[in-house]
Amino acid sequence: MPPRDSGPDVTHADFDAEPAWTPPSWEQIVEEHSPRVYRLAYRLSGNRHDAEDLTQETFVRVFRSLSSYQPGTFEGWLHRITTNLFLDSARRKSRIRFEALGEDDGARLVTPSGRGTPERGFEHQNLDYDVQAALDALSPEYRAAVVLCDIEGLSYEEIAATLGIKMGTVRSRIHRARAQLRSALAHRAQSVEVG
């Protein structure tokens, strides 16, 4: 004899079913996740304007794809979208190389009053110029892997899923990126030893 239910219309599926996922509002998504998406976009792109564009593109993509989102790690999904958009952009720009401004050129960009914009102040307080310049010198694939690992704190498994590559490739890219970063930042270690 089957077990009795607590009511005539109740089935075991009713007890096992999870509540339906309700997508958050557009405002909730942007308010909660924009600082993290912008930080990732800035570290990947290396400048404020590209980071703003990448952040905007990410949220446009999220808005278009939210109905097909399968509940899981929302932050991981945002990382994947942001990183893939960055890599797509880097591939499109691969034929054109832009040279970074030298230290002497930067002095010409200071506002006449001698003060920078609020964004520039934030960057100077929170982002290290040498580290960002070293990140910018990496290939987009290496940069994405090392930023996701060392700055965003993702595991190798999460990076592999985000980038759609094998775990061995993740390890290799991170190892090579770190070696290039060590080489690019070697002058800092020497100045610490001297000082």
Predicted features, each with a name:
Residues M1-D14, P24-S25, D104, E157, ...:
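C-terminal edge and immediately downstream basic/flexible tail or linker adjoining helix-turn-helix-like DNA-binding
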Residues R39, D53-V60, R64, T73-N84:
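Structural recognition of an alpha-helix C-terminal capping motif at a helix-to-coil junction
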Residues A133-A144, L148-T169, S183:
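Helix-turn-helix DNA-binding module
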Residues T83-L101, V110, G116, H124, ...:
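Arg/Lys-rich amphipathic alpha helix in sigma70-family domain 2
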